Structure formats: structure tokens, C-alpha cells
Amino acid sequence: MQGIIFDVQRWSLHDGPGIRSNIFLKGCPLSCLWCSNPESQDKNKELAFFKDKCIGCLCCIKDCHYGAITQGEEERIIDYKICREHCYSEKEHAFSCVKECYAEALKIMGRTTSVEQVMEEVLCDEEIYKKSGGGITVTGGEPFSQPEFLYEILKATKEKRIHTAIESCLFAKWEVIEKCLPFVNFIFMDFKLLDEAEHKKYTGVSNQLILENMKKLSDYKKNHEIDIVVRTPIIPKVNDDVETIHKICDWIVENLPEIREYQLLPYHRLGRGKYANIGKKYEMTELEVPSESKMKELEKQIERHGLIIAKY
């Protein structure tokens, strides 16, 4: 079984208990405007250009079989539409420019790998997981966008008696989610917005399937040992007001009786530079990072609703 990942991040401390390895799968049905990993959205491998590394050797232009790279007045110009048509579908000569870029200014985002190769990588830290109470966290992208690959990773990890976690927006068929649950110890559920129109505006999809899956996970928790935490990224001018968080807390209390932990994650700017690298435009350039006082103000809503402020 093979899938496409774009990173394995070892020694993570923020996506579950203990010390963990985060496995980032490519592909996501959402297109959140603030996404910090835009290279995770496309399910295929894609080209990234790091301008600061380019030495101007012109090898990429000579070796591109599809004419996607040309020389502008000051820098390379990449027609990513041509790349998507020919290279992202991995036709003959796909990403030949990368092979000729000795300065490593051109890179392929994503790599095809097997379950066995993933396990070989994460098992390097097996003793650390056991001593720290850690394990693996499968994230992305959206893990359920590669359901069979995800299932096999989780199954192989549980066979080694290693703790497993998933970070998911839950935009997937329930049957797909349910199949994986016997091999999952911990789930982070992303709850971005309650209002359906707002959710569609900022993520590109309705949230109705997501909300239904949250309810089903709460029901599942009644009879199964599994930790579930709701997570909301706090995005200025989108969901950073008291009323929005108040309504989300109300909904959690009313619809997710088995789930008590809720975590608010402050917006950060770490992913902004990635957009230009893959030929995309970052739409939320004016956003400021939420202040500590703003985050505490919003967290008070969690406590007032009798929920637990989660910290991971």
C-alpha cells in the first residue's frame, strides 16, 4: 500500500500526549484561506520554487520538456498551470527541472511512500514514544483524503502497541472514519466555524457533513475508549469574537455530550511564504496574530460552558 506524504516531523510536542512523530498526508477537501500548509491541499505532488536559492544557471529552463519555465526580466517565471497538467499527473519527464536544479531552488512537494517505509521512519523513536507516553499523529492535509493508506498506517502502528492520533476536519464519509476508529486512541476534531455560509466562504465547503460526523464521534465515545478534543484555529476577523466562540461552545455542549475538551489555537503567519513557492496567492496578508489577552478572553467562554480548556 502506497500513499503521498509531504513530511514526517519527529519530536513533536503539540499534537497529542508525549513526544510524537507527525505524519503529514497530502490532499485536503477544504481550502482554508489561512491554511499554514498550502502544499498539503493538492493530493498530487507539486513543484515549489525557492527564489532565494536560485543561482541563475538556467538549467531548469533547458530541461523543462513542457515549456513551463521561462526567464523574466529579473527572475524565473513558472506557469504552474502547465505543471499541473503535465507533471502533477506524473506524466513522462515529470519534474525533470528538479533533477537538474543543483542549487535545490526547485523541489517536489510530496513523495510517494509505502506503509512499510513510513513505519521504518517512525519506529526510529519507538522507545521515546513508550517512555514519554507519545506515539504518532497523522495529519495533513486531511488524513481521510487517503483512507486506505491511513487505515494501513494506523493498523501497523497499533500492532506495535504505539499510541495513535489523528488531526482531522472530518469532511469524509462516516464509513471511512468508522473503519479507522478501532486503531485510533486520540482524535483532534477541527471546528472552524458554526455558520454554514461563513464556513463555505472561508473553507470552500459546507460544514454539515463535518457537524454530523462530530455527533457520531461523540456517540461512538460512549462505548469506546478514545480521547477526543475539539480544536478551533482563531482567525482575526473570521472567528475571533466572543459571540462566535460562545455559539460554538453552546453547540458542543448541546450536541457532543461525551466530549469535554476544547482547544483554541491562535493564528500564526508561519505558512505565508509557502504560497508564492507553489504559485498561489495568500489572501489574508493583513491579519495580525491574536494577543494573549484576546485568547484568554475567548477561553473564558470555554470555562463558562463547563468545558475543559485543552492544551497540547
Set out the residue ranges of the language-model regions.
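ABC-type ATPase nucleotide-binding domain
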Residues: C35, E104, D190
